[in-house]
A protein has these predicted regions:
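Juxta-kinase regulatory segment immediately upstream of eukaryotic protein kinase catalytic domains
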Residues: 1-22
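Active-site activation/catalytic loop segments of kinase-like enzymes and analogous catalytic loops
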Residues: 238-275, 289-307
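Helical subdomain adjoining the active site within ATP-dependent kinase catalytic cores
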Residues: 277, 281, 295-335
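Catalytic-loop of the protein kinase fold
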Residues: 205-207, 212
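Activation of the activation-loop gatekeeper triad in protein kinase-fold domains
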Residues: 226-231
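ATP-binding pocket architecture of kinase catalytic cores
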Residues: 27-188, 196-202
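Conserved protein kinase catalytic-loop anchor
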Residues: 203-205, 223
Length: 335
């Protein structure tokens, strides 16, 4: 969807749903994930209110991360429970709306900045004390999110994800690796994970891409968690493993190292303190995270190199594909 289409849709939406006294202010495209993401403002009298709208691409089957509407009940439930996520004042589940002809959600736009750990944006502090707070708040907030009572608040939101499926679903992704050695390493890692698969506890809500780059910080403190496209119900240690993988200097290459990560043992300790329990099998989930990101890189590096989706970041990640699979195998062997 082009910017002008979104502009016309929002102008009509504001007139219909808010009133003639309100108007569309600024509008800009943002970095989305599976869908289309735009930042905009509603000017209503003396108030200027910032929002985010997410829409799916046209012609794509609505499933999983391309079903943007599924985030609406989740974010509303989390927000109502006092957790740091944006509220969703408007959402439309089906295509039969007069504004966009697509499902959409409109979220409040929270203040603050993200902390993309490999290459923080200009103006984001790299001071070790500030970075320590970014990482610490990220871990402790994860423990709070995992304590969310999904069975009470979202019992029918999502079919639980079986852990075996979380391993095998990446086969068709890593099969597209541009380098045969990557696909061979992926298959070996998949077999090792399946052969050592633990009981998937604790079980509940997971984010799916939890790291400081998907958190918002203001005045040094975490104020929001965003980008819930990959969320689901399943093994929550997926998120802890992912955070450990992001912080793990063993897999990253010079020039693409995470900025001032906490030691891995401290990440685990902070999470355990927040949950009131130290969990088994954390190393296995750390290995799974390496396998997941390396497999995702197999596809995205191919798309970048063939010119189908220009994104130089994946060349950085591509240099870590084999180290990630090797690290996963070592973690499984030692788990």
């Amino acid at each position: 969807m082009q910017l002008d289409e979104v502009r016309h849709g929002l102008e009509a939406f504001i007139a219909d749903e808010i009133g003639a006294q309100a108007r569309l202010g600024s509008l800009a495209e943002s970095d989305g994930h599976a869908g289309l993401t735009f930042l905009f403002e509603i000017v209503d009298g003396a108030r200027t209110l910032p929002y985010v709208i997410k829409l799916p691409p046209r012609g794509v089957r609505r499933s999983g991360n391309t079903d943007v509407y599924r985030q609406a009940p989740l974010l509303r439930a989390l927000h109502a429970d006092g957790l740091p996520v944006p509220d969703v004042p408007w959402a439309w589940e089906h295509e039969d709306n007069p504004w966009f002809g697509l499902p959409f959600i409109i979220m409040e736009r929270l203040p603050g900045h993200t902390f993309f750990v490999w290459d923080p944006a200009a103006g984001v502090s790299r001071d070790p004390a500030d970075c320590e707070r970014y990482w610490t708040d990220c871990v402790t907030t994860l423990a709070r999110l995992h304590a969310f009572d999904w069975q009470r608040h979202l019992p029918d939101w999502e079919a639980p994800m079986e852990l075996e499926r979380e391993i095998t679903r990446w086969e068709r992704i890593y099969a597209q690796a541009p380098e045969p050695a990557w696909a061979r390493a992926a298959a070996a890692t998949e077999r090792a994970l399946l052969d050592s698969m633990p009981a998937a506890l604790p079980f509940g809500l997971f984010h799916g891409d939890y790291q400081p780059g998907n958190c918002l910080y203001q005045d040094g403190s975490l104020v929001g968690v965003i980008d819930w496209e990959l969320s689901g119900i399943g093994a929550q240690l997926l998120d802890l493993g992912w955070l450990l993988m992001v912080a793990d200097a063993a897999i990253w290459t010079p020039g693409w190292m995470p900025v001032n990560p906490l030691p891995l043992a401290r990440v685990r300790a902070l999470y355990a303190a927040g949950r009131g329990e130290d969990f088994d099998h954390v190393d296995w989930f750390h290995a799974l995270a390496n396998y997941r990101l390396a497999s995702i890189a197999c596809l995205n590096v191919k798309l970048h190199r063939t010119g189908k989706r220009h994104d130089p970041i994946w060349e950085h990640n591509g240099r870590s594909v084999l180290p990630m699979y090797e690290r996963a195998l070592a973690l499984v062997a030692g788990a």
